[in-house]
Amino acid sequence: MPLTCAERHIFGKSAPISRICAVELTSVAHIREVGITAADMCAYAWHMETTLDGEQVLSDEGYNAFDEERWAPEPPKSKSRTAFERDRARLIHSSALRRLGAKSQILIAGTDDFARTRLTHTLEVAQIGRQIGALLGCDPDVVDCACLAHDLGHPPFGHNGERALADIAGNIGGFEGNAQTMRILTRLEPKIFHPDGRSAGVNLTRAALDAAVKYPWTLAEADRHPKGERSKKFCVYPDDEPVFRWLKIGAPQAAKPMECQIMDLSDDIAYSVHDVEDSIATGAFDPIVLADPKMLDHIIEQTRAWYGAKWDADKLLAAFMRLRREHLFPAHFNGSRESLAQLKNITSDLIGRFCWSVETATRDTYGPGPLTRYSSNIVIPEDTNYEIVALKGIAVYFVMAPREREPFHQEELKIVSDLVDVLMADSPLPSDALESQFLADWNESTNDNERLRVAIDQVASLTDNSALALHSILC
């Protein structure tokens, strides 16, 4: 029996079976009602498999109740929404997401009405992620959740603030924006509590939380990784490891699910395309300079210094040549409505170009059907990778690297460090500047290391403007 009109409205006219399986199927009658056959259920139901050595591991297809499980138990909810739709709603309504509106992307938040903030960047990542996820058969809400969550842990002043907090937290497990995201999702954002009274954060489903974990290893695992690929990034602090171990039950070690890989790529696409758009619109970058071979050499040199020598200079040059040859930079920009429209159309063309190339390459490798969770890996053609990095290099050369030479760049580091010092000044007595929720965490702490983590949590939660304002009052 085919889907009814109402069901098609809920699931979409071409919803993959894996999407439909996200709905709780409570009876044979309901299975028949939504038009899922026994063969469909066998093909796409998520289950545990036993390996040759007897180990229980996750199978690699679809979504089921295991993926909908939450870290803290919750009472049954209305069937009007899927578990993944609830995840997305919790993030949309979170204060952590709202705060991104006043946090820097590449230009200081609030200094230009055109340029993006972390929030607008996040929304654009989510739109791109949903598009790629739909092309590859993922549940769009799982991908959307990963995209909405991916920057929640960024402190004030972006990577600059991150570096300052990492230095301060060196002896207590470090600081990393992705690990802070995990902490926000599973502890700091107020929504759900464990039966024993501990905060469970927004308590996302396993599939949604797993999709948001971009670097699925601890700091200790990163430091001893033989390939050296994880030397700086990690996703969890020592006191948050229990939820990480629960999250990764049965998952391949250090592997990222397809939905997380889509989020990661969508972030790169949005960052590369939109930050160049901002650079052009604000006058930081004029594409005409790309006609100068010496300028291209300088940009490529800076790109490789920033992103690593693994990016071949000749291939980066070829990427710039392709983008120019195919008119994917505006020939002229003067701020008029017409030039803004041309710029916007070019950004749309670039996003479509990258999404199409990835879909084609991934489908060529894995074939049709839903590509979910640990069933597959996203395939990014080399030319696409180089074009994305070339665009990111433009933002580095014309915006990010010059900012690091500005006096205020060093001042940002000092502001973040000063705020932590003030909050810790009277330890074990709490500072009057601690917000209520962090004051409660402070009062539950038993030593200075725990209290330092609380101080870092509060400073990391600040926006650029609130950090400046608090510093002007306290320091």
Swiss-Prot record:
Domain HD, first and last residues per copy: 118-272
GO BP of this protein: dGTP catabolic process
Keyword Hydrolase belongs to the record: yes
InterPro entries given in the database record: dGTPase, dGTPase-like, HD/PDEase_dom, HD_domain, PHydrolase_assoc_dom
GO MF terms, alphabetically ordered: dGTPase activity
Keywords: Hydrolase
UniProt cross-references to PANTHER family, sorted A to Z: DEOXYGUANOSINETRIPHOSPHATE TRIPHOSPHOHYDROLASE, DEOXYNUCLEOSIDE TRIPHOSPHATE TRIPHOSPHOHYDROLASE
Family: Belongs to the dGTPase family. Type 2 subfamily.
Name of the protein described by the UniProt record: Deoxyguanosinetriphosphate triphosphohydrolase-like protein
